[in-house]
Amino acid sequence: MAVLEVLTFPDDRLRTVAKPVKTVTPEIQTFIDDMIETMYDEEGIGLAATQVDFHQRIVVIDVSETRDEPMVLINPVITQKSGDDGIEEGCLSVPGAKGMVPRSAEVSVTALDRDGNEFSFDADDLLAICVQHELDHLEGKLFVDYLSPLKRKRIKEKLEKIKKFNEKN
């Protein structure tokens, strides 16, 4: 397994709409393992394939307290939403930034597992929010898109300064 490089805002590749996975191959399964390792290495609770510059509809999530229950969602679709919720979200692709994002309180999801078998589940609380956040990535959308233009601009400027500093050192 390998830790993958996570793209950071404002990288245009994060705006790519992911394509469906046609066939779950051994290469896709290895890539999923790398995504899970990357998510844990970055101390995240979710990671979409687009965040690591692979533009297919794959998401990994682990909101468990023990950090040992990864969920794999291939070609996920939210089939139903209800209620209103929202928390101050962060993102591995927007390091150091947080913002309040409105989300549905409950979602129903259908996806394929890592072996290509279809399954469905209902989610609420943090899992529902995380699913919505990661599926946004598959559509080329980031949590900063929900923020005011001024806050988004400030976050972008801050991350660009950090990037320039890191490139010099």
From Swiss-Prot:
Record: active site: E134
Recorded catalytic activity of this chain's protein: N-terminal N-formyl-L-methionyl-[peptide] + H2O = N-terminal L-methionyl-[peptide] + formate
Cofactor binding note: Binds 1 Fe(2+) ion.
GO BP annotations listed: co-translational protein modification; translation
EC top class named in words: hydrolase
A GO term for molecular function: peptide deformylase activity
Gene3D superfamilies linked to this entry: Peptide deformylase (3.90.45.10)
Listed InterPro entries: Peptide_deformylase, Peptide_deformylase_sf
EC number(s) given by UniProt: 3.5.1.88
Alphabetical UniProt keywords: Hydrolase, Iron, Metal-binding, Protein biosynthesis
List of residues binding Fe cation: C91, H133, H137
Cofactor requirements of the protein: Fe(2+)
Domain of life per record: Bacteria
CDD domains: Pep_deformylase (cd00487)
Known function: Removes the formyl group from the N-terminal Met of newly synthesized proteins. Requires at least a dipeptide for an efficient rate of reaction. N-terminal L-methionine is a prerequisite for activity but the enzyme has broad specificity at other positions.
UniProt similarity note: Belongs to the polypeptide deformylase family.
Family matches, as HAMAP family: Pep_deformylase
NCBIfam families: pept_deformyl, PRK00150.1-3
Protein name: Peptide deformylase
Native source species: Aliivibrio salmonicida (strain LFI1238) (Vibrio salmonicida (strain LFI1238))
